[in-house]
Amino acid sequence: MLDIKWIRENAEVLDAALAKRGAEPLSQGLIALDEKRRSIIQSVQDMQSRRNAASKEIGAAMAQKNTELAEKLKGEVADIKTSLPAAEEEERVLTAELNDALSRIPNIPLDDVPVGKDEHDNVVKHSWGAKPAWNHKPKEHYEIGEELGYMDFERAAKLSGSRFTVLTSQLARLERALGQFMLDLHTSEHGYTEVSSPLMVRDEAMFGTGQLPKFAEDSFRTTGGHWLIPTAEVTLTNLVSGDILDQEKLPLRFTALTPSFRSEAGSAGRDTRGMLRQHQFWKCELVSITDAESSIAEHERMTACAEEVLKRLGLHYRVMTLSTGDMGFGARKTYDLEVWLPGQDTYREISSCSVCGDFQARRMNARYRGKDDKGTKFVHTLNGSGTAVGRCLIAVLENYLNDDGSVTVPDALLPYMGGLKRIERAA
């Protein structure tokens, strides 16, 4: 969330940033609303001050036996007490209206983010590896999985409807191996602390990371009022909600392997076959909490950690710098890792790593204090996938497919597969 004081002082900067995102200018409406709110706040404070002063004057008048003045002052106090609740309610309404408006404004892109309308304006940062060269015709993951006999969309549909998958036997183990491999890599080599956190959260947590109020339709809400997490970013980032951290202890780096739940409300007709776009999927999430000076460098580090997963698995990928029109609501800059899928003959996103500055921290009221500082500053937050497990499984199936229809297990996963080196058709 942006600071209204900053908006008052940087109205043109805000409108220019919104224009880069393809949004209409908002600064003047926000400033007008804030001026109205500040005016009523001043009125409330003036009434409260006059009420308190008049109350003291009543005592002085009574001491001087000036009954006429005392009665006049009592009438003034009574009038203030009558008017004050309405003014306080107006202040509350205007404050809520302003906060709601501020909560719906996207973050300000960094200056080096490419300006564009959508994904077609994203820029290739670099790539790694090469596309596999085969004699056989590539297949899509759902063809491979069904032919192996371990991927069942029909049974999943009977259980839960569309956009779900049942994996069994060797593919279920491969999915588990991928998640465990990612978690071990990030905790053992990359310095992240593993966290086991709830899969259901309150409104406040979803607001803190920016899912609410603007993107409520993208998530699932229980009848009890909890939300199923669309990503572990929600829980990991909110671990510091309301805290004042010691700068010396930053950065904090958290990781979690969890299911994620998404309604895919805006994805009708897209990726309807297979596992690419599911209502439920596993993901290894990375979150960093830094001071203001370190967040840009941490963004590069986090992205490199996610890249290492794909390098260890021998998967060709490219890193894209997202344009302003394709970047997420809370991000100041985002790198997408796109893995090569031979079956689709294209690159698909497998990880998204974003630096959010203090945007989420303001919503969560998460701060830090330097060793010699009296005041506090908002922390900076970063999040990324390290990586999406289901999409990584898709990439392994399509890139490690053999001529006979079997799939070779990548070397990095062998310690997790109980000696299984090749996934073959079910007997």
Swiss-Prot record:
Bridged cysteine pairs (disulfide): none
Protein EC: 6.1.1.11
UniProt keyword terms in alphabetical order: Aminoacyl-tRNA synthetase, ATP-binding, Cytoplasm, Ligase, Nucleotide-binding, Protein biosynthesis
Annotated pathway: Aminoacyl-tRNA biosynthesis; selenocysteinyl-tRNA(Sec) biosynthesis; L-seryl-tRNA(Sec) from L-serine and tRNA(Sec): step 1/1
Binding-site residues for L-serine, renumbered to this chain: 231-233, 285, 385
GO biological process: selenocysteine biosynthetic process; seryl-tRNA aminoacylation
Transmembrane segments: none
Compartment(s) where it occurs, according to its Swiss-Prot or TrEMBL record: Cytoplasm
Subunit structure: Homodimer. The tRNA molecule binds across the dimer.
Recorded family membership: Belongs to the class-II aminoacyl-tRNA synthetase family. Type-1 seryl-tRNA synthetase subfamily.
Function as written in the Swiss-Prot or TrEMBL entry: Catalyzes the attachment of serine to tRNA(Ser). Is also able to aminoacylate tRNA(Sec) with serine, to form the misacylated tRNA L-seryl-tRNA(Sec), which will be further converted into selenocysteinyl-tRNA(Sec).
PANTHER family from the UniProt entry: SERINE--TRNA LIGASE, SERYL-TRNA SYNTHETASE
Protein's name according to its UniProt entry: Serine--tRNA ligase
Organism name: Rhizobium rhizogenes (strain K84 / ATCC BAA-868)
